């Protein structure tokens, strides 16, 4: 109770999490930058696969870059990443989707994305359908 061995909240209830309830402006800036970086990687992958398919057909790199028709990736997962309805770009997302995520246990069914474990390593872009 008193003295050198008094009870503290981490000792009493286990690990004390100290996550603020809102994201700082610096966290939001870095989150937007991460979203833009992912968009850039997807764009480069799509462009590289387009150039590869053009070169398979006998076109040069310059002709492939200047062609008006862009070939879509053959893999279904990459085609889905290019669809805005499935994986929107950073500038197409609302601020609610950038910084908040769906949580069925939360009061308003939303929680800050910074409370998701490993939130800097995953890309959460869409809320569930009809939400």
Curated annotation (Swiss-Prot):
Family that this chain belongs to: Belongs to the mitochondrion-specific ribosomal protein mL60 family.
Origin organism lineage: Eukaryota, Fungi, Dikarya, Ascomycota, Saccharomycotina
Name the record gives this protein: Large ribosomal subunit protein mL60
Primary location group: mitochondrion
InterPro entries: Ribosomal_mL60
Superkingdom: Eukaryota
Endpoints of the signal sequence: none
Pfam families: L31
Gene it is expressed from: MRPL31
A single BP term in Gene Ontology: mitochondrial translation
Miscellaneous: Present with 2100 molecules/cell in log phase SD medium.
SUBUNIT field: Component of the mitochondrial large ribosomal subunit (mt-LSU). Mature yeast 74S mitochondrial ribosomes consist of a small (37S) and a large (54S) subunit. The 37S small subunit contains a 15S ribosomal RNA (15S mt-rRNA) and 34 different proteins. The 54S large subunit contains a 21S rRNA (21S mt-rRNA) and 46 different proteins.
GO molecular function ontology, one term from the record: structural constituent of ribosome
Function in brief: Component of the mitochondrial ribosome (mitoribosome), a dedicated translation machinery responsible for the synthesis of mitochondrial genome-encoded proteins, including at least some of the essential transmembrane subunits of the mitochondrial respiratory chain. The mitoribosomes are attached to the mitochondrial inner membrane and translation products are cotranslationally integrated into the membrane.
Transit peptide feature range: 1-12
Gene Ontology CC terms: mitochondrial inner membrane; mitochondrial large ribosomal subunit; mitochondrion
Cellular compartment(s): Mitochondrion
Alphabetized UniProt keyword annotations: Mitochondrion, Ribonucleoprotein, Ribosomal protein, Transit peptide
């Amino acid at each position: 109770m008193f003295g050198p061995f008094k009870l503290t909240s981490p000792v009493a209830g286990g690990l004390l999490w100290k996550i603020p309830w809102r994201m700082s402006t610096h966290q939001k800036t870095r989150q937007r930058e991460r979203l833009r970086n992912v968009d850039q990687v997807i764009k480069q992958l799509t462009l590289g696969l387009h150039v590869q398919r053009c070169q398979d057909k006998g076109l040069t790199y310059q002709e492939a870059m200047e062609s008006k028709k862009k070939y879509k990736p053959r893999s279904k997962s990459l085609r889905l990443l290019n669809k805005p309805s499935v994986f929107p770009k950073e500038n197409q997302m609302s601020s609610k989707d950038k910084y908040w995520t769906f949580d069925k246990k939360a009061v308003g069914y939303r929680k800050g994305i910074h409370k998701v474990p490993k939130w800097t390593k995953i890309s959460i872009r869409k809320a569930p359908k009809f939400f």
